[in-house]
Amino acid sequence: MTKYIFVTGGVASSVGKGITVASLGRLLKSRGISVSIQKLDPYINVDPGTMSPYQHGEVFVTEDGAETDLDLGHYERFIDENLSRVNNITTGQIYSSVIQKERRGDFLGGTIQVIPHITNEIKSRVALVAKNTNADVVIVEIGGTVGDIESLPFLEAIRQMKKDVGRDNVMYIHVTLLPYLQASGELKTKPTQHSIAELRRVGISPAVVLCRSDLPVDDDMREKIALFADLPNEAVVALPTVDSIYEVPLVLEEAGLGDLIIERLALAAQPVQLDEWRSLVARIKQPKRHTTVAIVGKYVELRDAYMSVAESVRHAGWAQDIQVDIKWVSSEELEVADPVTMLGDVQGIIVPGGFGYRGVEGKIRAVRYARENKIPFLGLCLGMQCATIEFARFALNAPDANSTEFNPNTKLPVIDFMPDQLDISDKGGTMRLGVYPCILAPDTKAAKAYGRELALERHRHRFEFNNKYRKAMEAAGFVISGHSPDGRLVEIVELRDHPWFVASQFHPEFKSRPNNPHPLFRDFVQAALEQIAE
């Protein structure tokens, strides 16, 4: 029978609950236990697909085309498993489903209430993960903090799960913050005590309390929290801030949390195998070489908007004992600034995805700088479209070249709406989403990177390369190195006369893993390092 671990948060949001959950998954998987992880988001949006990156950060796309919370990216990277749309549930999805059932008459005229109808729907979504994956353990993160009004139905649902599946099959873990008061020079436990009391008020008693802090937590403080929480001292685990998020599984393992979970849930575990993870952390801490690459985007003030891109760059570096320093460059500032001033000190340039015209001309200037100065370049989604526009404007001498996203009346639409997107009015969940096959052209940089003829990559876009201009572009040195199986959709482009210039319509960053970097990022970082040697 599947066991469940429910992870709640207290005192403050953004304390690293998602990383903690992902790390728990890694600890269990390192013991031969199959794991799946689910995120319950209390917001009323159906999904984050139409939310501003400034409010939500990155939208992470799963293999089956779900637009999900960025924490799912952490989950996939830590447990090295592909997740699906059932792994991210929102209040919007829950209420939409219940209302649809009521309209169909599924409730036989009954009065629809939060309890039992909403809570039953939540529980059914949690159970669906276990059914679909047959995992030994499903770890469920409840978004937000205890005390948030939006979270109450989710807390009630996970409280009921203990009765539904048996108390021996459920474990509650509470992640809380120990704030530091500079005036008194100490960490304070009172907010954590109140958070635990609030959790108990809704009928949940945590079996483990994880204490996040920027400073070490001494034994006396842990004992104080354990006394208040009615827990053994070893069930209060200190989780201080570390240099790399990939250290967290090792910190938790050293604290004995892995064994504690195994004992509490009576899991049949193999001896722990974390040697590969320890080797990863050692490479992170002791790089042999360094290089700097720029990420040019319009959301660089909130780096969470490019979470998977940044992580993929780092993965590629660590695999080659390289520390990749990221220079964040505002594409809006680059529209008016000298590119040499902003990009002259980097060995590689990435233009990631995005939507809307704001900052696009700055991205195009970054592409031009990379092309003309032979700087390694990687374009992602919109970055590929910007590379297409730049080449048409400045290599083909077609200054009017543009995308119909930015200028619907452009005379040279080298990027245009996909035909099946023309009649779509709803914005949410209607793009070309999820994994699609890509045929790689032989003797290209893309084919060399992948080492095979077929790639399966995740997409999130409405616009595509306009094949009307394909022959003219190719004649000038623009290489179509990847396309859909029917040959109609351009998936990867590169330049013939450039050391390393590759751009993809898909999002390779969603498939990179810390111990298995994506081949396009790997070769991009290698090309950037070679710039230093030159």
UniProtKB/Swiss-Prot annotation:
Where, in this chain's numbering, is Mg(2+) bound? D71, E141
User: Which residues take part in binding CTP?
Assistant: S13, D148, I149, E150, K188, T189, K190, P191, T192, Q193, K224
Binding sites annotated in the UniProt record for L-glutamine: Y54, G354, L382, G383, M384, Q385, E405, R462
Q: Where is the active site?
A: C381 (nucleophile), H507, E509
UniProt-annotated binding residues for ATP: S14, V15, G16, K17, G18, I19, D71
| Modulation of this protein's activity | Allosterically activated by GTP, when glutamine is the substrate; GTP has no effect on the reaction when ammonia is the substrate. The allosteric effector GTP functions by stabilizing the protein conformation that binds the tetrahedral intermediate(s) formed during glutamine hydrolysis. Inhibited by the product CTP, via allosteric rather than competitive inhibition.
The UniProt annotation places UTP binding at S13, K188, T189, K190, P191, T192, Q193, K224
Q: Which GO terms describe its biological process?
A: 'de novo' CTP biosynthetic process; pyrimidine nucleobase biosynthetic process
Spell out the molecular function terms from Gene Ontology: ATP binding; CTP synthase activity; glutaminase activity; identical protein binding; metal ion binding
> Per the similarity annotation, which family is this?
Belongs to the CTP synthase family.
What is known about what this protein does?
A: Catalyzes the ATP-dependent amination of UTP to CTP with either L-glutamine or ammonia as the source of nitrogen. Regulates intracellular CTP levels through interactions with the four ribonucleotide triphosphates.
* Protein name (database record): CTP synthase
In its UniProt entry, the species of origin is given as Herpetosiphon aurantiacus (strain ATCC 23779 / DSM 785 / 114-95)
This protein's gene is called pyrG
